[in-house]
Amino acid sequence: MATSDSNMLLNYVPVYVMLPLGVVNVDNVFEDPDGLKEQLLQLRAAGVDGVMVDVWWGIIELKGPKQYDWRAYRSLFQLVQECGLTLQAIMSFHQCGGNVGDIVNIPIPQWVLDIGESNHDIFYTNRSGTRNKEYLTVGVDNEPIFHGRTAIEIYSDYMKSFRENMSDFLESGLIIDIEVGLGPAGELRYPSYPQSQGWEFPRIGEFQCYDKYLKADFKAAVARAGHPEWELPDDAGKYNDVPESTGFFKSNGTYVTEKGKFFLTWYSNKLLNHGDQILDEANKAFLGCKVKLAIKVSGIHWWYKVENHAAELTAGYYNLNDRDGYRPIARMLSRHHAILNFTCLEMRDSEQPSDAKSGPQELVQQVLSGGWREDIRVAGENALPRYDATAYNQIILNAKPQGVNNNGPPKLSMFGVTYLRLSDDLLQKSNFNIFKKFVLKMHADQDYCANPQKYNHAITPLKPSAPKIPIEVLLEATKPTLPFPWLPETDMKVDG
């Protein structure tokens, strides 16, 4: 039963729900406002705090450079506001389609794809030369090849246009988070495991740095390091290999050599710098707005329990038993006052196939602990749709790993959790009844609270980013530390 107690309210973790992928369709039409309104009112009645939505670059800037059309999204935002929910807006600079759960297809803008017809190297590329059109390679971040603009300038202009065209919703407090898309599926990573190219879970994936821009960048980096003879990896296997079948990832393979370490540092640093640069632009675009910036980091839990962490390495997370690949990301976010949003909160090790050597529970503990140690806010979401008590209990445990505190704020607490995703299945009666209990337990058995200040979530105007942190200082965060201890199970079970 819900109550209201000021101490218990400090244990309240807000719950958001991801809207359907095609809520604004590929033709920039908000198709079914009446149907969505009915669903949003059900969410509001269930105590849900807000919703998250992808704001697709491929829809908004479809017609040509700087030709933005925000009208359909304005109608959507108006409806969300009328239903009494808050909004997390994702700047989705990636393609929808080709990843787990993608049921609609929204490519990046055609005028960008047209540039890619004559210059294939604007896309991430694997060693055999296959291009991936989901997202522009970090290699073109600062190349002015898009009708005179760089990729970073494109993203920056888009965010500025969003601010100008959504200023009333920013001022009214509807929009509370801007999640900045930084890669495929909106995640800060390389597209190392594309289903569209035949990758199957739980295989290792492939490095994606063989476009001409990243090749040239690596060539310059090895020359500066005094090793001009070093090349990009040629022994890391194919998408569906296992680590031990490759020269790179096998025991004592290339990944532990000086050459391998140099490559992995370069490959992961490119992502760190990419995120840092775009967050600088996001900070300028939304400076003074009452919003938080956020980014998403992918939960690559397969091969976590072996020495080589192969699937994480191909995705750009240089994480090994003796090197923390996630805490430097958290440290980079700290200067932008940004939230780290992590996936796979619902997963338990025992649910994964044994051949995947999977450790979602340990991975979540590592990433969240690293964020908290860097004094940033961490949020999260489930990776796959689940409607069962076991999954909800795992999410609640991760949201409050050391349980609730009856006398004040909990020692550890996530800033928010976004449930993936709104659907007819979720709203089916028995599923929705369990979901309502989940929301109540996330809220520490408290009534829905419309005033975030009461649970220490007051949103203040966005301050300027702090000065750039030198890469050497970011990489000091790779030194491994033990994660915070977690309770064996939550003290706020939905079925307890």
From Swiss-Prot:
Q: Where along the chain is substrate bound?
A: 54, 94, 102, 296, 301, 343, 382-383, 421
Query: Which PROSITE patterns does the protein's record reference?
Result: BETA_AMYLASE_1, BETA_AMYLASE_2
Q: Does the keyword Oxidoreductase apply?
A: no
Q: Write one Gene Ontology MF term.
A: beta-amylase activity
Residues bearing PTM N-acetylalanine: 2
Cross-referenced InterPro entries: Glyco_hydro_14 (IPR001554), Glyco_hydro_14_CS (IPR018238), Glyco_hydro_14B_pln (IPR001371), Glycoside_hydrolase_SF (IPR017853)
Tell me one Pfam family matched here: Glyco_hydro_14
Any one biological process term the GO annotation gives: polysaccharide catabolic process
Specify the effect of residue 343 to V. Reduces activity 16-fold
Q: Which keywords does this chain's UniProt record carry?
A: Acetylation, Carbohydrate metabolism, Glycosidase, Hydrolase, Polysaccharide degradation
The source's domain of life comes to: Eukaryota
Q: Coiled coil: which residue ranges?
A: none
Q: Which residues form the active site?
A: 187, 381
Q: How does it assemble?
A: Monomer.
**What protein family is recorded?**
Belongs to the glycosyl hydrolase 14 family.
Q: What is this protein called?
A: Beta-amylase
Q: Which organism is it from?
A: Glycine max
